[in-house]
């Protein structure tokens, strides 16, 4: 609490000024006016007085209990060792000192300090008096000798006698001075000294005495300052103890802080008490030691040695808690977090348990949870993005860009499979791409730029098959305008709706192209009506979505569609910087024999030149060559231009961004960071074993796995097939992709398929010669595909073969027992009438009595008249005998069989 005036204090406690003034007077404080200040110490004294007057009793004692459990190995009488749990319980009691006793101790210490000071002053005065008396006696003796020797002796004799007397008198004076501290010194042989030597000696002794006095005064001042600091600290602690509850002081933000201070003070006071006891020895002993000690200190000071006083222990004030600035990433390990806060990991895990999070020291927690932990422990959390290295690189590249110009639009053609997307693009390009594709469907993202009369337009052709959802999503994110192709004779289909959702999610403008208008079954109004169900209202129906009716076969409406594209591009005012480092997106990547990794990219900013250092995903390398979509070599590519580049060490992931960097060291650092992050994610996915997954895996002993090794021609197709295969998994058969990659099938793939009993599938790739020889030797069948339908259908068939068959029961016939007679051969025989179906001799039967199953077994005999027969049809009589059971009149004989039905995915 800060210093406050009496009026502010009255407002704070909602009392009148006069009432507060009366309380201050009752508490023993001087009277004050309403504008006078009340210090913090006086406020604490007032609160203590009010608590005491209201009858509140202080808690002076607090007990802390601890319990530790350990295990010990004990050898019994039989010689066998066993584990014994050992529990150790400890109890510590902390008692708050009585303020009255504390005040008495402070007063006693002050009195002891004053007495010590007086004794030191008296001893100094005694030394001065003894020295002064010795000097006076020496001066008187010298004067008397001069007077006696003033007569008729020769000058030489006078000098000798005078010097002899001076030496004798000086020896007596020195002996008298040494008797002052009551210590006898043996007489030495007198030495004759000259007047100059005597004067130098006296000067030296005076200087040494002055230095001793200065040193004694300095030590006295240091002792007084240390005593004052200790007493001030005790007064503060006494003030705190006088009005605070010791139990309440153990708060979350300063656990055991007061206890540590108290222990430090008690230890310091105990040492001071021991020093006082040792210092209360006889004054005579101290007097004998002091002079020798002072002389040693003077000699040490001259030689640069430290005094023994410097090594003496003094009480130091406890250091306050250090607040750390803790940097926290998006994910952080508990042990690392504890290390950054300079605490034990156990304390962090305990705090997490209180928050409801049960984690170990080597597990990761998110950034929000870690920030709460850091704040709870009194430190400053500093959130740091895990992509800081990438962000810094991006900022450095952005600073070098300039010269913003208009760029061509990037248009993505989307729609359902077989609705004519590629045919429309062929008509615009005047090529025949669709006829050359496997199955007549697009299975890659194709990027083309077309020079029309209205300017350059870049087209992205996406696949429409359901398995290529990720490809369509990437196409929508990298584009400026989406052309939604809908067949006039087919209408809205699932992939059409998905394309609309992708366009909305990316915020891309939409242009509807109703294709196949040349067909007689075309119904554009039905298409427009179906589009309104997805809230796509065209301009023809009063909406804001442009629409064109086209025919990719005849070319009808193509010019109108291109006009709509250019108009939309002008409204969007598409611009991009042409100078500086290039940046864009990887559309597709693949491995080609003799060329290595080939990446199809779309430049979005800047200009890409041959020889630039490109960072794409986890890989970086220099651009060795660039080609356009027709295979023609180019030297540079500006914004909105698609090209294929060579020079990367491996195929980057489709959809990842690429960036041209100038510093190879920085590129390596970012690439290694991304690769490490990807490895950690894969390892986390593989080793993730949580409680939920443990319950899911229980009871799945009969679960079957179909192991697959998949190789494709491009990265995008690989991702699409992996997602499609994962969706095929059921509760009984799981598809497990052991290995996957881009490029031809190698010998290592065949070896892996042999060891893991996996199916080896190739999509638009072939096995090399070494792989073929290895497959023939191991008897492994390699399956090749060029259409995604065939691959998925074959995997489904393989999974269906791994399913356990379904058993279904079929009732074949029912016969009623009309009479029962005895047979010497079969025992009880029944005469029956077949009322439904056919009764078979070699099939299983049930005996129903009162419509309840009484017996299940086999027929022993089936006869028609006296002939044994294998079956009896409905409406005919027969005789039968049931093996191991006696039937009765009125029973029903039900004949059935169990059929196995092979299930399919």
UniProtKB/Swiss-Prot annotation:
Residues 461-464 are annotated as: G3. GTP binds at residues 415-422, 461-465, 515-518. Residues 551-553 are annotated as: G5. Residues 116-138, 190-230, 269-278 have a biased composition (Basic and acidic residues). PROSITE patterns: G_TR_2, IF2. Residues 415-422 are annotated as: G1. Residues 406-575 form the tr-type G domain. Residues 440-444 are annotated as: G2. InterPro entries: DNA-bd_dom_put_sf, EF-G-like_DII, IF2_assoc_dom_bac, IF2_II, IF2_N, P-loop_NTPase, Small_GTP-bd, T_Tr_GTP-bd_dom. GO terms for molecular function: GTP binding; GTPase activity; translation initiation factor activity. Residues 52-84, 116-230, 269-318 are annotated as: Disordered. It is found in: Cytoplasm. Transmembrane segments: none annotated. Residues 65-84 have a biased composition (Polar residues). Its main location: cytoplasm. Keywords: Cytoplasm, GTP-binding, Initiation factor, Nucleotide-binding, Protein biosynthesis. One of the essential components for the initiation of protein synthesis. Protects formylmethionyl-tRNA from spontaneous hydrolysis and promotes its binding to the 30S ribosomal subunits. Also involved in the hydrolysis of GTP during the formation of the 70S ribosomal complex. This is Translation initiation factor IF-2. The lineage of its organism: Bacteria, Pseudomonadati, Pseudomonadota, Gammaproteobacteria, Moraxellales.
């Amino acid at each position: 609490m800060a210093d406050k005036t009496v009026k502010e204090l009255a407002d704070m406690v909602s009392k009148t000024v006069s009432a507060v003034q009366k309380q201050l007077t009752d508490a023993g404080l001087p009277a004050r006016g309403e504008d006078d200040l009340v210090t913090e110490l006086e406020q604490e004294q007032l609160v203590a007085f009010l608590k005491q007057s209201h009858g509140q009793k202080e808690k002076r004692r607090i007990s802390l209990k601890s319990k530790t459990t350990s295990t010990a190995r004990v050898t019994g009488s039989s010689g066998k060792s066993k584990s014994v749990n050992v529990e150790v319980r400890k109890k510590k009691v902390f008692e708050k000192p009585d303020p009255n006793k504390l005040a008495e101790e402070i007063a006693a210490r002050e009195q002891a300090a004053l007495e010590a000071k007086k004794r030191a002053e008296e001893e100094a005065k005694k030394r001065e008096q003894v020295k002064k008396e010795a000097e006076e006696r020496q001066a008187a003796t010298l004067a008397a000798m001069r007077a006696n020797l003033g007569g008729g002796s020769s000058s030489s004799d006078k000098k000798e006698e005078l010097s002899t007397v001076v030496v004798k008198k000086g020896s007596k004076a020195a002996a008298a001075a040494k008797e002052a501290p009551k210590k006898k010194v043996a007489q030495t042989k007198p030495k004759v000294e000259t007047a100059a030597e005597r004067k130098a000696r006296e000067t030296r002794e005076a200087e040494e005495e002055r230095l001793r006095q200065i040193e004694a005064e300095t030590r006295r001042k240091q002792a007084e300052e240390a005593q004052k600091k200790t007493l001030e600290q005790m007064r503060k602690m006494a003030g705190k103890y006088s009005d605070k509850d010791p139990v309440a002081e153990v708060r979350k933000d300063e656990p055991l802080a007061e206890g540590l201070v108290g222990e430090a003070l008690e230890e310091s006071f105990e040492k001071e008490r021991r020093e006082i006891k040792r210092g209360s020895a006889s004054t005579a002993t101290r007097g004998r030691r002091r002079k020798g000690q002072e002389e040693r200190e003077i000699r040490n000071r001259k030689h640069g040695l430290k005094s023994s006083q410097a090594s003496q222990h003094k009480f130091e004030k406890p250091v306050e808690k250090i607040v750390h600035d803790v940097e926290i990433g998006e994910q952080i390990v508990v042990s690392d977090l504890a290390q950054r806060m300079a605490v034990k990991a156990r304390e962090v895990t305990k705090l997490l348990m209180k928050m409801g999070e049960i984690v170990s020291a080597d597990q990761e927690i998110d950034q929000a949870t870690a920030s709460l932990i850091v704040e709870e422990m009194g430190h400053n959390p500093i959130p740091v993005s895990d992509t800081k290295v990438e962000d810094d690189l991006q900022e450095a590249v952005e600073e070098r860009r300039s010269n913003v110009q208009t760029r061509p639009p990037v248009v993505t053609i989307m729609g359902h499979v077989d609705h004519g997307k590629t045919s429309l693009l062929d008509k615009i390009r005047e090529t025949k791409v669709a006829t050359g594709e496997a199955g007549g469907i697009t299975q890659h993202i194709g990027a083309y730029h077309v020079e029309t009369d209205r300017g350059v337009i870049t087209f992205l052709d996406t696949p429409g098959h359901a398995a290529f959802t990720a490809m369509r999503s990437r196409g929508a994110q990298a584009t400026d305008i989406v052309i939604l192709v809908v067949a006039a004779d087919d209408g809205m289909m699932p992939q059409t709706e998905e394309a609309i959702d992708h366009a909305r999610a990316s915020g891309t403008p939409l242009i509807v192209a109703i294709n196949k208008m040349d067909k007689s079954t075309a119904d554009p109004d039905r298409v427009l009506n179906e589009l309104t169900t997805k809230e796509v209202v065209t301009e023809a129906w009063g909406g804001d979505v442009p629409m064109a009716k086209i025919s990719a076969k005849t070319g009808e409406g193509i010019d109108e569609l291109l006009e709509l594209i250019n108009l939309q591009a002008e409204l969007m005012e598409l611009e991009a910087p042409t100078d500086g480092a290039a940046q864009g997106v990887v559309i597709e990547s693949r491995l080609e024999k003799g060329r290595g990794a080939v990446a199809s990219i779309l430049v979005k900013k800047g200009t890409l030149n041959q020889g630039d250092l490109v960072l794409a995903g986890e890989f970086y390398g220099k651009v060795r060559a660039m080609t356009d979509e027709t295979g023609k070599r180019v030297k540079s590519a500006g914004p909105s231009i698609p090209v294929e580049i060579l020079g990367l060490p491996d195929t980057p992931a489709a959809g990842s961004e690429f960036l041209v960097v100038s510093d190879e060291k920085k590129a390596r650092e970012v690439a290694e960071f991304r690769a490490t992050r990807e490895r950690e994610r894969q390892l986390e996915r593989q080793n993730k074993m949580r409680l939920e997954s443990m319950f899911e895996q229980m009871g799945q002993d009969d679960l079957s796995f179909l192991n697959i090794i998949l190789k494709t021609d491009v990265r995008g197709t690989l991702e699409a097939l992996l997602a499609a295969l994962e969706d095929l998994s059921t509760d009984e058969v799981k598809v497990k992709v052991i290995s996957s990659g881009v490029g031809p099938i190698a010998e290592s793939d065949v070896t892996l398929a042999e060891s893991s009993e996996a199916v080896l599938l190739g999509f638009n790739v072939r096995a090399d010669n070494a792989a073929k020889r290895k497959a023939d030797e191991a008897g492994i069948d390699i399956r090749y595909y060029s259409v995604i339908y065939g691959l998925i259908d074959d995997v489904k068939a393989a999974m269906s073969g791994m399913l356990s068959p379904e058993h279904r029961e079929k009732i074949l016939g029912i016969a009623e027992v009309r009479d029962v007679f005895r047979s010497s051969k079969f025992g009880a025989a029944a005469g029956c009438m077949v009322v439904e179906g056919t009764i078979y001799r070699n099939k299983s039967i049930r005996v129903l009595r009162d419509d309840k199953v009484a017996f299940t077994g086999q027929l022993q005999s089936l006869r028609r008249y006296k002939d044994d027969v294998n079956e009896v049809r409905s409406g005919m009589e027969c005789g039968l005998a049931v093996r191991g059971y006696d039937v009765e009149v009125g029973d029903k004989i039900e004949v059935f069989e169990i059929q196995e039905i092979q299930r399919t995915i």
